[in-house]
Amino acid sequence: MVVKVGINGFGRIGRIVFRNAIEHDDIQIVAVNDPFIEPKYAEYMLRYDSTHGNFKGTIAVEGSDLVVNGKKVKFYTERDPSAIPWSETGADYIVESTGVFTTTEKASAHLKGGAKKVIISAPSADAPMYVMGVNNESYDGSANVISNASCTTNCLAPLAKVIHDNFTIVEGLMTTVHSYTATQKTVDGPSSKDWRGGRTAAQNIIPSSTGAAKAVGKVIPDLNGKLTGMSMRVPTANVSVVDLTVRIEKGASYDEIKEVVKKASEGPLAGILAYTEDEVVSSDMNGNPASSIFDAKAGISLNKNFVKLVSWYDNEWGYSRRVLDLISYVAKVDASKA
């Protein structure tokens, strides 16, 4: 089944979700809303991308709408989500990627315009969070607003699940070495709530907070309170890497751990958790659609119960692909209950 999807917010994730949708057989983007971008500029921003290259296809503007690969995509410029007429295009599922409407109440405004479900492309304080390959099967169709969690949680959770299912995680700490994002500064500037975050992104390694590790406890309840973490923002434009250090109950050699992760990447988590023994660096992962790419040669163990694991992720491309995979999955569940 092909799911008709609308995107609210044509920023970094909104555009990368759109690009991914071109490669996704189950998804058709039928409408986009962004009050700060006019259609001609939206065409330009979709066509050219400094990180992921030029758009592979045709894009044009027809009136106030986009035409992508010969198909019309309605373009709206509404500030109020409740005023977007999603029903005009049959957009049943909405990607909420503004970064503004991240609560159930705020994101529910899309339902007034005819949307059936809203998927927030960010963590949410109160909407149920789902991570593909981890807890998506717990979705029962009852929630109209859900969250795809964060890019870091999508990298960490599948790996943590495999380790916990096989060796039982006692406790752990995570550091994500994370590329800079749009919220950071090009030069030193005011940032009253996060002084370090106000320093220039391209010149500094900047320690920062992240809720990604604690959020794993929401999608894997058994790990609630057992993981926490932090972030180091670094001067790279894209691709990040999780460093997960855990104490495990069932002792195992590093080779045994590698084998378990490799097996999972070829089985139930194929396409979500990937595995490599190549001598890779961050740029090699640019455009990788997996949520988490386990780097077998980068990890180390101190003993059979204490291990450091390393997993890469394209925090833009891989995450955006999961947003669409989640939509495809929930649409099938919803259809089965109709």
Curated annotation (Swiss-Prot):
Site (Activates thiol group during catalysis): H178
Stretch forming the signal peptide: none
Superkingdom of this protein's organism: Eukaryota
Active-site residues (renumbered): C151 (nucleophile)
Residues that hold NAD(+) according to the record: R12, I13, D34, R79, N315
Keyword NADP recorded: no
EC number in record: 1.2.1.12
This protein's UniProt keywords: Cytoplasm, Glycolysis, NAD, Oxidoreductase
PROSITE patterns recorded: GAPDH
Compartmental location: Cytoplasm
Gene Ontology cellular component terms for the protein in this record: cytosol
Molecular function terms from GO: glyceraldehyde-3-phosphate dehydrogenase (NAD+) (phosphorylating) activity; NAD binding; NADP binding
Swiss-Prot/TrEMBL catalytic activity: D-glyceraldehyde 3-phosphate + phosphate + NAD(+) = (2R)-3-phospho-glyceroyl phosphate + NADH + H(+)
InterPro entries named in the record: GlycerAld/Erythrose_P_DH, GlycerAld_3-P_DH_AS, GlycerAld_3-P_DH_cat, GlycerAld_3-P_DH_NAD(P)-bd, Glyceraldehyde-3-P_DH_1, NAD(P)-bd_dom_sf
Principal EC category: oxidoreductase
GO annotation terms (biological process): glucose metabolic process; glycolytic process
List of residues binding D-glyceraldehyde 3-phosphate: S150, C151, T152, T181, T210, G211, R233
SMART domains membership: Gp_dh_N
UniProt keyword annotation of Oxidoreductase present: yes
Matches recorded under Pfam families: Gp_dh_C, Gp_dh_N
Pathway note: Carbohydrate degradation; glycolysis; pyruvate from D-glyceraldehyde 3-phosphate: step 1/5
Gene3D superfamilies: Dihydrodipicolinate Reductase, domain 2, NAD(P)-binding Rossmann-like Domain
Family of this protein: Belongs to the glyceraldehyde-3-phosphate dehydrogenase family.
Quaternary data: Homotetramer.
Protein name: Glyceraldehyde-3-phosphate dehydrogenase
Organism encoding this protein: Sordaria macrospora
